Amino acid sequence: MVIGGGDTGNDCVGTAVRQGARSVRQFEFLPAAPDARAASNPWPQWPNVKKTDYGQQEAIAAMGGEMRAWGVDTLEVLLDKKGAAAGLRVVDLDWSAGKPERIAGSEHEVPAQLVLIACGFTGPEHGVFDAVGVPVATAGRPLPVMAAEGSHLAARVDGVAADAAPVYVAGDARNGSSLVVNAMADALACAAEIADALEL
């Protein structure tokens, strides 16, 4: 089960298919875009049309039909007795008024053995960094954690003890929203920096 759309959601869907998933579904919070560009959406505006990228194309072919659903709000990830994902509790949304309204009586459960949350490009979670005294810039779009040039070691707010454990950041939290492959490469570089600091 992939929650979210865009390039990240498409990559999740395509990867799941290529790794042999027997069933793949994708839920999108937003309503489905039109199949054709509307007159109210002229060039040079970004075209608001339904996009079916490589991952969805592969999934549709493998699953024998459309595997996406739009206007779906995930309320809860359901767990089995061992704490593993067992499904989702979701509700359908009505966007006709220009904003999401939950449709009464539409709540239902969907089985799932793996849930991938493909909701990105929103910046780091501030609460995590607030808890360890690391400042996060908030001007404009969500920005990454402040770190020294060329380093993964995060800056600290005034008042944090000098001997406090260091905090390292990588991926979107350090560089801003980007591709998963960039975050993975940055995580490896961060791990090497930590290993060096610990003299491992």
Regions found by a protein language model. Give the residues of each.
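Active-site lining segments that contact anionic ligands and/or coordinate catalytic metals
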Residues: 24, 65, 69, 85-87, ...
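FAD-site-proximal beta/loop scaffold in flavoenzymes
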Residues: 96-177
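Rossmann-like dinucleotide-binding cores of NAD(P)H-dependent redox enzymes
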Residues: 13-76
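Beta1/beta-strand and adjacent pyrophosphate-binding region of the FAD-binding site
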Residues: 1-6
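Flexible loop/turn segments at secondary-structure boundaries
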Residues: 8-12, 32-36, 76-78, 95-98, ...
